[in-house]
Amino acid sequence: MIPPATIYLIPTFLDEDALTVLPEYITQAVKTCDVFFVENERSARRFLKKLWKEMEIDRYDWFVIHKSEESTKTEFLHQVKQGKQIGILSEAGCPGIADPGQLLVAAAHQAGAIVKPLVGPSSILLALMASGMNGQQFQFNGYLPV
């Protein structure tokens, strides 16, 4: 019997100078991954190479997450059914928070995978902390248009 897949929600930095604030166990989780689902492949590869300098980037399978592509979800579930160790990375901050990775996390739960969120920066949480607003009663309605 194939053991259940583990999905690591790998945070990325919001500022390139902030690499040192990420805990070491994030690097350890990256080292266990077989495949990565990312919002942007180029920036994810760069980030992971900075995090783990010895990483052989081309040894891994990479899939780009698109909000509405059923093919990405289908490939993700295929990897989950094989019991793979999967890393999900967003462009900046924590995957699954106002991020297309949320769709894969929901699919992972439905498929019985183990989902492990890793501690990291979140622009939403940082904005709430700096606002002085009541953290018990706030609502996030999306990012401002760029």
Q: What do the predicted segments below correspond to?
A:
Residues R42-A44, G93-C94, S123:
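Alpha-helix capping/helix-boundary segments
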Residues K73-V115:
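Glycine/small-residue-rich loop that forms an oxyanion/phosphate-binding "nest" at active or ligand-binding sites
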Residues V38-E39, S90, V115-G120:
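General beta-strand structural signal in soluble alpha/beta enzymes
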Residues F63-E70, Y143-P145:
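Conserved helicase motor
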Residues M1-I65:
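Glycine-rich, flexible N-terminal cofactor/catalytic loop recognition
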Residues Y8, L103-V146:
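Class I SAM-dependent methyltransferase SAM-binding "motif I" and its flanking Rossmann-like core
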Residues T6-I10, Q82-S90, F138:
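Generic beta-sheet signal
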Residues K49, H66-H78:
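Short, structured surface patches at the beginning of a domain
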